[in-house]
Amino acid sequence: MAFYLEKDYFQDIELFNLLQQKAKGKELTLHWYEAKTERVRLAPRDPARGLTYEDCNVGSYGYDQLPELLRTNYSMAPRGAELWGTLPDLGYTVNRKSAVWADNVAALYEEAKARRWAPAVDLAWEALAQAPVPEVLEAALAQLCTFLQECAAGALGLAAHWLSRINQELLELKSYLCLQMLDQARHIEVLRKRALAGGQGLKRASVSAEQALKELCAAETYPAASVGGHLLLGSFLLGVYRQVAAVAPSPVDLQLCRLVVQDTARMVAYGSGQVRYHLAHQPQQAAFLQDYLDRAEHCLVGLMGSPECVEPLILLCGGGSAPEQVQGGSQRVARLQAGIVAEYLERCEGAGLRGRTERSRLPHYLKRSR
């Protein structure tokens, strides 16, 4: 929906005359000079890390002082600035701190900056040509890279969907979500380049995975989107990347997975912290999240059971396509899937969703499928 000002500044004679006077150095009001704001002088607590958001957590500028319900600022004004005049209402729909906050969000933001990497130069791409991966494994990698790009696009879209809806007072959280989007964009980049650099190109999109991702991205509230995107999807991706790192057919693939794992681990850490903070301040919402997961956990089945995911994983884990390799790979993938579910449920329990392990249909489903 478009927004139009009540006035056209091209037609504002008063503003034009004011600009003329200022250009001549006349009639400076300097009303901003004595703004009704808190004066502070900050210094890094750890010079090696520099001045961090945690160092800036002081007084009216800090996030600890934020109220639970954000009632006074719906504009773009930075937290701690003097609010005056008619600032626009941007229509934020997430105005409750405990709906989105996590105690570790400022630290995760700083970590994401400190550990940034560039796919173009931080991987030894030339090594792929010097020591090519066997064709069957290269094809499996290309398919898995295709699938994982779809997952990264889903995680990116989830963060992007909520970013403009969250009140600007929660600036550290919004800054972290921006870096999470950058992480996922970087994953799309590196996975695409890996598939194209190995001689195979991209393979086949996954219908079941994309349907599952769409459902997770369509969660009606941020807490539901977070538990579904950061814990459910994040646990799946973290498990897959760690497994591929364990069976990586080349040093390039090992380094790629190690770098992606550190980014994905941050996403999961934020998700755990967000759910924990949310339930600590709104314990009555545990029933809502439990009900949401009752309905959403089938999406993990759609991801894990996608032929475009499970089959290339079997070949990579087995080391090839010979019958005995497929058999061995299948067993390793079965253990991987069980591990993903167990770690996801453990994270839910640790975040405050007590009884999730007994309530979830995932363990029973996996047991029946073996």
Task: Describe each PLM feature range.
Residues 139-148, 169-184, 226, 251-264, ...:
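Alpha-helical scaffold segments that form or flank carboxylate-/histidine-based iron centers
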Residues 157, 189, 193-196, 243, ...:
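Charged/polar positions within long, soluble alpha-helices
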Residues 237-241, 275, 300, 340-341:
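Hydrophobic alpha-helical core bundles mediating ligand binding, dimerization, or RNAP-core interactions
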